[in-house]
Amino acid sequence: MEHIYQYAWIIPFLPLPVPLLIGAGLLFFPTATKNLRRIWAFSSISLLSIVMIFSMKLAIQQINSNSIYQYLWSWTINNDFSLEFGYLMDPLTSIMSMLITTVAILVLIYSDNYMSHDQGYLRFFAYMSFFNTSMLGLVTSSNLIQIYIFWELVGMCSYLLIGFWFTRPIAANACQKAFVTNRVGDFGLLLGILGLYWITGSFEFRDLFEIFNNLIKNNEVNSLFCILCAFLLFAGAVAKSAQFPLHVWLPDAMEGPTPISALIHAATMVAAGIFLVARLLPLFVVIPYIMYVISFIGIITVLLGATLALAQKDIKRSLAYYTMSQLGYMMLALGMGSYRTALFHLITHAYSKALLFLASGSLIHSMGTIVGYSPDKSQNMVLMGGLTKHVPITKTSFLIGTLSLCGIPPLACFWSKDEILNDSWVYSPIFAIIAYFTAGLTAFYMFRIYLLTFEGHLNFFCKNYSGKKSSSFYSISLWGKKELKTINQKISLLNLLTMNNKERASFFSKKPYEINVKLTKLLRSFITITYFENKNISLYPYESDNTMLFPLIILIMFTLFVGFIGIPFNQEGMDLDILTKWLTPSINLLHSNSENFVDWYEFVINAIFSISIAFFGIFIAFFFYKPIYSSLKNFDLINSFDKRGQKRILGDNIITIIYNWSANRGYIDAFYSTFLIKGIRSLSELVSFFDRRIIDGIPNGFGVTSFFVGEGIKYVGGGRISSYLFWYLLYVSIFLFIFTFT
């Protein structure tokens, strides 16, 4: 079967003809290309399906034979330098290829209907196809140079798609923010690659790992320099996977179309950082300090993402912060050395998160029939509510995805998340406590999203939620309050830390008041939606078309069953752990003397604890967000909380602190804006002044002085010989006078 591997080089290039042909068609035959636009969507899906089938065949071959195949072409060779390009087919490559293709195919099918009203339909599919090509090229790369090339292409495509509606200033700003933030990590990655080449003299993974490990083992290289290079490599993953402190671009990236949000969060851009750390893990494991840094950054991101999600009203931003938190779990697992567990959670999270984002896109699409094109309203959860009877299939999809991400068995994320939580006890009890606490917090805010969206009544016709906003740069808490606009204010460090809201937070909604229902027209005439304004406007949302529902149903099946590939049981006559066989040999620092299998009793005891925490978070969410007419509302219990006196005041203060922290994004964006952005701008203005006034001023001063001296001499001479003779005799007389008397 080795001949199968010989043709694996076509994997990244099969989707490439679509963007090339779309570009050529729009250049030479624009009318025909636009009229036949759905053919290009069909071509994108068909070519990607071929890649998926080929990847599956390679994966089956690797499961059966545990083979690794690498093919290289020499690009340049001389005495001191050699550079080769090729492809590497190993378990990590096959897993990522299958993950990318399956999710991307479903997203493309979904996008055909979701983007049908957009004049940028062809541009969207061209970007998406090139995005898939770049990501497939990244995961099949055999050396760091190829990794970096495709790494930059993945970033470029993501910027294009985040700023897809570039005529909206908010989307353009989000694109710039993603670009600038990722520049920091990408520059670190480039420096790390160059540093490793200086140490090892190779870019190829196999040679690099072997040489680097030998140098470290024999103490033949400066350890501080090795730590620095490894940290710079990790910095690239921190930015790409939205880890603290370079996470600030991810929530704003939701300004792009919802299908690309699903693809970015499930299987492409943010997964690229996890893939890079997994690929370079043999290099990181020989440097314990870097492993500590990876796990520490991971656990901070886990907690930070969960707390920042609490006060969001925008459904896509809430899911974005959840993605950030789950990526932190994966990074924590890699830092602990649980290679298999991290990849397992990457797989299960990808399908569950794609399901949630596509379901949220269906909701946004349906809400658009009421509010028109207005992201401030169509994505606002507190304007939703009571959608169960209007969008039952979407509701079921969202509920299954929510239960999976909360860690409820037997759904996919339960199996992988539970393994990470168990491994965290072995690694660090403090990290384990934070991880378990965040698991409960995750269940709370995920069910908050579900209850605000689907339970109760449609709140768009009520006034008790502040739904009208001037821009999308706001975050509204679960209590329906505006976030302070701190970014454009002049604030000091003291004000930054003591930032507060003037209104008082409350868990409970106020009495609803009816408002005058008026469906506004499109607020932004420059948006490329042609006839959405005048058609399909109704008083209530309705279920999406079958083209959008089909991917949801397929993702439900993945969410239900994909977790079973990694069940860690190995009893008599039963060998269910396909993932471990697939990843053989793999790295596991926490269980180096075991076979990664546990018995039923140990598994059940650990699972009961994590499930109990998840159900506790769900119960708290139901307690606060279940509709007021629900039988689950215990008003005696609620009133008992309202009569606590001093304890009530303390509780309200704690709630306000949590709200302010979450609504202001942990003050991190404000800190960057105040001290970094303004500081850099002030420094650049100072440098510009020094350059223009000092550096350029010196030669300009000499030039101006010479000009005026020459002009003065010209007017003094006047062009007459008698004047020249007079001045000549005058200067000679003065010279003789001075010489005589000195």
UniProtKB/Swiss-Prot annotation:
Its main location: plastid. Belongs to the complex I subunit 5 family. Gene3D superfamilies: 1.20.5.2700. It comes from Spinacia oleracea (Spinach). It catalyses: a plastoquinone + NADH + (n+1) H(+)(in) = a plastoquinol + NAD(+) + n H(+)(out); a plastoquinone + NADPH + (n+1) H(+)(in) = a plastoquinol + NADP(+) + n H(+)(out). The lineage of its organism: Eukaryota, Viridiplantae, Streptophyta, Embryophyta, Tracheophyta. GO terms for cellular component: chloroplast thylakoid membrane. This is NAD(P)H-quinone oxidoreductase subunit 5, chloroplastic. The keyword Isomerase does not apply. It holds the Pfam family Proton_antipo_M. The keyword Plastid applies. The gene is ndhF. The chain crosses the membrane at residues 9-29, 39-59, 91-111, 125-145, 147-167, 185-205, 224-244, 258-278, 280-300, 327-347, 354-374, 396-416, 425-445, 549-569, 603-623, 721-741. It is a multi-pass membrane protein. GO terms for biological process: ATP synthesis coupled electron transport; electron transport coupled proton transport. NDH shuttles electrons from NAD(P)H:plastoquinone, via FMN and iron-sulfur (Fe-S) centers, to quinones in the photosynthetic chain and possibly in a chloroplast respiratory chain. The immediate electron acceptor for the enzyme in this species is believed to be plastoquinone. Couples the redox reaction to proton translocation, and thus conserves the redox energy in a proton gradient. It is found in: Plastid, Chloroplast thylakoid membrane. It is an enzyme of class 7 (translocase). InterPro entries: NADH_UbQ_OxRdtase_chlpt_su5_C, NADHpl_OxRdtase_5_subgr, ND/Mrp_TM, NU5C-like, Proton_antipo_N. NDH is composed of at least 16 different subunits, 5 of which are encoded in the nucleus. GO terms for molecular function: NADH dehydrogenase (ubiquinone) activity; quinone binding. Keywords: Chloroplast, Membrane, NAD, NADP, Plastid, Plastoquinone, Quinone, Thylakoid, Translocase, Transmembrane, Transmembrane helix, Transport. Its EC number is 7.1.1.-.
